[in-house]
Amino acid sequence: MFCLTLTLAAHGWGAGKLTAPELIALAKAHGPELRAGIEATFDAKDLKEGTAWAGQGPEFFFAVEAATAPTLVVDEQPGLPMEALPGSQLWFGIAYVMPVGRLHQFHYVVNGADFGGRLDMPAFGPLSYLQPGVPGGKLSEKLIHTSKIYDGMKSEYWIYVPAQYDPATPVAVMVFQDGGGYIDRTGNNPVLNAVDNLIAQKKIPVMICVFINPGDIADAPGTPTYKAVKGHADRWGRTLKDAMRSTLYDTVSDRYVRFLRDEVLAEVGAKYNLRKDGYSHAITGASSGGICSFNAAWQMPNEFSRVLSLIGSFTSIQWKEDPAVAEGGQDYPDKILREPKRNLRVWLQDGANDMENPRWGSWPLANIRMANALKTRDYDFHFSFGKGTHNGGQGAAEFPEEMVWLWRDYDAAKTAQEYVPDPTEKGKPFFRVSSLNRDEQ
């Protein structure tokens, strides 16, 4: 879609903001600094709308502005009374939310009516926090690549090298689309912590991670790529940068995976000893980055054989935008059914409250179609379908589990493996819409 937004009402980091443990400690002590801490940490809009929260592990802090006493409801469990802050209309509460590594929801009940809340509240597990004694890897400075395949497009990217990397031994590689959203250890998607922990526990192989942002074509006016992207932007009222991202990620062709293979990974491989086999290459992204990752592996399964697609945009965003490309993302379920089977391992994630777009289609139904097509053809796949929106929270909370599943049974002595369905998936039924969110007629 347009961009990946990981929406947390409070990050707890930055000037004046408090972490969830700090807020919880103040709340338990009934310290006089609590009100100032709440007002510094949360936006006034989130407090008024009942969408403010902060969490670490299973411990969560909630704050809301209300004229009368609100009750907090988490995952439809019995309500928790909130405590008033004297001299204000602010209320606060603490909740212990389980299980971790999962997405949760909350809302309030005020005067008998539901109010505020969010459907996307991830509870991160221990593996999303760097564990004691685990060595952290090194993130490069921001690098810039100028593309030939995309006529001078400039892309920002970062290289992450784990502490266990030995230049004498070639290592696996994983490429992250919208990469800048994954490089903050204390952010909404603490991938670096999980990678370090999982490598240390030998649950995934030693790997170099490449975090790449969508490119910018603004400095290459007059080129064929610029003209095509500018045309898409003008037709649909999108910015040039957003249209470039969609052109890269949503187009059903081999152009982007050639860009990764021939330019980006070639550049990274000149500095680090990367394995060349697709068995040792994984790719991931969210939203348009999700379909991008699947498309890259579909086009070149010998380059990428492991796919992690989060809230993937298997919809018609780039359909018929390029006259030379006949298909759109909405065609992938049928392509899976009708075309020769690829040797891929695929984790899909989406939420029941993902988008319904009048131009491009339904994200939840598209992902369900993808899952059923993969199951029909006996692909090695997993579909994690929750209740979330078009938001990265569920994928971020489940990331350690996703990685362990994606890299399970990896053997560095091999360069290939025929993927077969996970035994836990093999006997399960197809996905069905068994209930509707409306009264029966």
What residues fall within each predicted segment?
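Non-catalytic cap/lid and distal C-terminal segments of serine-dependent acyl enzymes
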Residues: A15-G79, L85-Q441
